[in-house]
């Protein structure tokens, strides 16, 4: 989930640093997110959610309940990993954590949802809220090549950070968080100050040219979401992850590629490289 806010130097995105001991991409800076749980499907109903029809239409290639569950999962994972709850009250406004008592209550809810003792549906029912699925704009669809028996089929969404909520890492799966512009994140990665997985790098490259959150959202709403399935090859003993648009990948990309269309795994991290034959 890309959570954006307007900053002095352009849109800033909220990123978290994965725990070093995480089996996959430990220590990397990523966007909050996770997987779909059974409870997400249980909450995927009109009485709990706004934007049900649009959510189903966004991912029309899936059964509607699965498409809606993807959106619910994005909301839940954002709450668990960043403490941001995309839900509205009866007045139509996003829930506010400005009041200390409310903030403490929802902070405990966040822990309980993470621990499995509480569901997102429990919270919205208790508080009289509705999950704001209509606040999520589909951004990308990535399917990673199988590596060490792991393969990920991931949907990226983008949203504007709600007022009166301050995201922060969970201090469990993630150990650090930061608001940062796409350009700054890329520069820090180039300087080996942070690690960015290839899909994260590519996403940041796509949004770094925009001056406001409104511009990012408008562009995202108009783009065609296609399945991105990088190819993993080995050249001269080096692992390469090739994106559509690279000379070694036959298919044409839906969007014009960035100058980097491949990533080389060097010294324990993926490094973006310009296309070459």
Where are the language model's segments positioned?
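N-terminal leader/linker segments that precede catalytic domains of diphosphate-processing enzymes
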Residues: 1-277
